[in-house]
A protein has these predicted regions:
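Phosphate-binding and adjacent anionic-ligand microenvironments
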Residues: 265-453
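Glycine-rich phosphate-binding loop
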Residues: 92-100, 104-106, 220-242, 247, ...
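An N-terminal, well-structured beta->alpha segment
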Residues: 1-62, 66-67, 93, 142-165
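N-terminal small/polar loop signature for handling phosphorylated ligands or for N-terminal nucleophile
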Residues: 42-106, 181-241
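Active-site nucleophile and cofactor-binding loops and adjacent substrate-binding regions
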Residues: 71-80, 247-250, 271-272, 293
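Gly/Ser/Thr-enriched, mixed-charge loops and adjacent short helices
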Residues: 105-223
Length: 453
């Protein structure tokens, strides 16, 4: 068994080699035992559009059933629908079979037990103890919360004026539901790559990468649309594109939402270490309390619950709305609320964002590293790095803060990569902090390629 599949947020690996029949059955059995220990015997399961979904589903059900737990099958749904079911349904446990934005050969499991996110690391040792799973009679029933979800989103996000909106689901799990939602809120919807297809024939469903947005940008301009939304493979991350085909950063998406929600209710706002330095300033300016947290939907959700936060957000596009909603990352609901906000304004997105302080930043940058060594490499970087006149933040990897710039280096929890990001008040400030990090990387890891992806 490949122990690297048990990660800090979830379980993720190659569908064929790592998530084989035996491994998935054991995982299902352990999860079932956790449910039974809470004196419950039911769980929701859903899956995204990946080609390996049904084989993994079959074996997960076998493991859960072997523990005496009945499975309510949500079918092919975006991850937020699984979360929604655990909030509204007859039990508060769920497993989503999804590879998120990993390569199409991968898959994984996002887990909710007793209304709380559960990481792969939390169950790893128990899975390793299981020698075999005795398959029982099937306990399986199909169910759906789509109609209830549509009604609730419509009640909260109906548009104040007509807007033409392009949706690109990237052939992931969000397409059919997203189109229905936007029709319900009275948008003029143009959907592309709507049909779920685990081959991802048009582009990879990762809206954080500019190369995956070429198609939606072209469609927005050709159709004269007001704006558009791109979703990731399982519908928990969103990208926003303007009428001129410009991508709006997640920093600015979170800022738009902060202005809106902090005008309704004051409270904490949680954000991850990759976010702009301007975000906590804006949160404070509008009467909120900024809370920086480790990257990862798992960490942000727990922090939102601990602090009863108004909302949370990550630079990767995970947005968590908690005021009048449920605090989980839901790209479709977030997109609907953003559309409502924009329908109430008499300005464009570009004009709205132009109000925010201008900085110069990179997108998320990745460097390939060995999966087994990445965390130790970050620790070595921290112990050997040399930065002058810097404030060091070690909440997640290392974030170096200087007067007019900052930089971040951390190990990805979901793939064999370093994650970096840089921001400066000027282009020169940005270049300076980036070059300072690269000098340290070259000195400490002379064999490491600085070919960013």
């Amino acid at each position: 068994m490949n122990l690297n599949i048990f990660r800090a947020y979830d379980i993720r690996g190659n569908a064929e080699a790592d998530l084989n029949d035996t491994t998935v059955q054991k995982i299902g059995y352990v999860l079932g035992k956790k449910v039974k220990s809470l004196r419950d015997d039911e769980i929701f399961v859903g899956y995204d559009s990946r080609l390996s979904r049904m084989e993994i589903f079959k074996n997960l059900v076998k493991g859960l059933n072997a523990a005496g737990v009945k499975v309510f099958n949500l079918g092919l749904v975006p991850t937020p629908m699984l979360y929604y079911a655990t909030k509204k349904g007859q039990c508060n446990h769920g497993v989503m079979i999804t590879g998120s934005h990993n390569p199409k050969e991968d898959n994984g499991l996002k887990i909710v037990i007793n209304d709380s996110p559960t990481s792969g690391l939390e169950i790893r040792d128990e899975v390793l103890k299981i020698e075999s799973v005795n398959v029982q009679d099937e306990l399986l029933e199909d169910t759906s919360f789509e109609n209830e979800y549509l009604r609730e989103v419509k009640a909260q996000a109906a548009l104040k004026r007509s807007l033409k909106i392009v949706l690109d689901a990237g052939n992931g799990a969000s397409g059919p539901l997203a189109t229905k939602v936007f029709k319900e809120i009275d948008a003029d919807v143009i959907a592309i790559n709507e049909t779920p297809d685990g081959n991802f024939p048009n582009h990879h469903p990762d809206p954080s990468k500019e190369k995956n947005l070429a198609q939606i940008k072209e469609k927005i301009i050709d159709e004269g649309a007001d704006f558009g939304f791109a979703f990731d493979g399982d519908g928990d991350r969103v990208g926003l594109i303007t009428s001129s085909g410009k991508q709006i950063s997640s920093d600015h998406i979170i800022m738009i939402l902060c202005e809106y929600y902090l005008n309704l209710v004051k409270g904490p706002v949680v954000f991850d270490v990759k976010c702009s330095n301007e975000l906590p300033k804006l949160i404070s300016m509008h009467g909120g309390q900024p809370i920086m947290e480790k990257t990862g939907h798992f960490n942000i959700k727990k922090s939102i619950r601990d602090h009863n936060a108004v909302l949370g957000g990550e630079m990767s596009g995970h947005i968590f709305l908690n005021h009048n909603w449920y605090g989980f990352d839901d790209a479709i609901y977030t997109a609907a609320i953003l559309s409502k906000i924009l329908s109430e304004q008499n300005i464009t997105i570009e004009e709205m964002v132009a109000r925010f302080p201008k900085t110069f930043s990179t997108p998320e940058l990745n460097l390939d590293v060995d999966d087994d060594d990445k965390f130790a490499m970050v620790e070595r970087f921290i112990s050997e790095m040399k930065f002058k006149d810097a404030e060091v933040n070690l909440i997640d990897g290392v974030r170096i803060n200087k007067k007019n710039c900052w930089g971040l280096l951390r190990a990805s929890n979901t793939s064999p990569k370093f994650v970096l990001r840089f921001e400066g008040s000027t282009e020169e400030d940005l270049r300076t902090i980036k070059e300072e990090f690269e000098l340290n990387l070259n000195t400490i890891f002379p064999d490491l390629s600085l070919d960013y992806s």
